[in-house]
A protein has these predicted regions:
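Non-heme Fe(II) oxygenase catalytic core, chiefly the N-lobe of the double-stranded beta-helix
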Residues: 1-138
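Catalytic core of Fe(II)/2-oxoglutarate
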Residues: 124-170
Length: 170
């Protein structure tokens, strides 16, 4: 994290034009169980979802920041963005898949509790409906990055959430 976080901070500022970035965690996902054993890595998520809801986005900010810092972020427009990339090898077998946000209706998002040992969260599961358009990034290389906006407190923006997951690419 000593090198990676500053690189991601600079990348997000350059790619989005934001002036402030707060990186609060990261997740490494590995399909191979042997590589997961005894390490802090998880399976790729195959269900289609979005990481935060109207309730859990601001709650997560309060969970990971001091009260003063959280209020500073929450008093202005803010977004939570995942940086998805392959590490070391191409991500062909389980690539990230996402929906065109213009094709997801608000009622396609279904709130679902996530209960951890130390906290309760909430995500959106995404139900299928006709008209949804999906795409993926084949053979993603370690030098390629996808940004997934998982929460935006601006209610008038074209995409507040990104329905996403992974799938088994035969």
């Amino acid at each position: 994290t000593g090198i990676y976080y500053p690189e991601i901070d600079a990348f997000l500022k350059s790619a989005t034009g934001v002036t402030s970035v707060h990186i609060f965690d990261h997740t490494i996902r590995v399909q191979d169980e042997g590589k997961r054993t005894g390490k802090q890595v998880r399976l790729p998520v195959a269900t289609i979802h979005n990481d935060y809801t109207e309730w859990s986005g601001p709650k997560r900010v309060r969970d990971v920041m001091s009260e003063a810092e959280a209020e500073r972020y929450l008093s202005h427009r803010f977004a939570m963005v995942n940086v998805w990339r392959s590490i070391g090898v191409s991500a062909e077998r389980l690539p990230v898949v996402m929906a065109d946000a213009r094709t997801i209706r608000p009622d396609d998002f279904v709130a679902s509790d996530l209960v951890y040992q130390d906290r309760k969260g909430e995500i959106f599961q995404v139900r299928h409906s006709m008209g949804q358009e999906w795409f993926y990034f084949p053979d993603m290389q370690p030098d390629e990055v996808v940004l997934l906006k998982c929460f935006d407190n601006a209610t008038d923006c074209p995409a507040r959430y990104t329905a996403h997951g992974t799938f088994e690419n035969p």
